[in-house]
A protein has these predicted regions:
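Active-site beta->alpha loop and helix N-cap motifs at the rims of alpha/beta catalytic domains
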Residues: 1-146, 163
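Catalytic alpha/beta core domains of metabolic enzymes, predominantly
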Residues: 126-130, 139-190
């Protein structure tokens, strides 16, 4: 677990709209040198859905090669389709990232808790690695799909070593407060 400030790092692009790896590495190092305890690349602020899988994986790998401790990284890996989410998540594990921050599938709205549970279950089965640590990403005002308290409790109960936490960006204190009551669930509000 990373304690302290985890910065949702911006993703800089060059004039050809490719990730500017040098600037990305410099930004990451500056954030870590100036008091951040960890980084969350490719979250909402990091333009996650503007970058393809290969470029995203290369950028995270570039951070590690530049000297950023992978145990200080929680990259965003959630996408609408399961195979791409599995691929990016496996890559983060291979790099020894501390965990992954995963959105629910968000293209179809109004998905039931059962459907969302099945998605995360298939993700965990597809990755098939006991080193997998998932931080669920709850930001319904952006992705249009929320995670209910009951769903998070069920996922934590079913996969206690894998579902380790939640990033709650909903801004709804009642959600944060309820998640704080779930045993052994790490809650990152904001």
């Amino acid at each position: 677990m990373i304690k302290g400030l985890i910065a949702p790092i911006l993703t800089p692009f060059d004039n050809n709209l490719n990730v500017d790896q040098s600037m990305y590495n410099d930004l990451a190092k500056s954030l870590m040198d100036n008091g951040c305890s960890g980084l969350a690349p490719f979250g909402t602020t990091g333009e996650a859905l503007s970058v393809g899988n290969k470029e995203r994986m290369n950028a995270i790998e570039g951070l590690v090669k530049s000297g950023i401790d992978p145990n200080k990284l929680i990259p965003g890996t959630g996408l609408c389709n399961l195979p791409d989410t599995i691929e990016i998540t496996k890559h983060a594990i291979d790099l020894k990232c501390q965990g992954v921050m995963t959105l629910p599938p968000f293209y179809f709205k109004g998905m039931s808790d059962t459907g969302l549970y099945n998605y995360f279950e298939k993700l965990i089965e597809g990755v098939d690695d006991n080193k997998l640590k998932i931080y669920l990403y709850h930001i319904p005002q952006v992705c249009g799909v929320g995670l209910s308290i009951d769903l998070v409790q069920k996922l934590k109960s079913s996969f206690p070593e894998t579902i380790v936490g939640i990033k709650d960006s909903s801004g709804v204190w009642e959600n944060t407060e309820a998640w704080l009551k779930i045993k052994d669930l790490i809650v990152y509000p904001g």
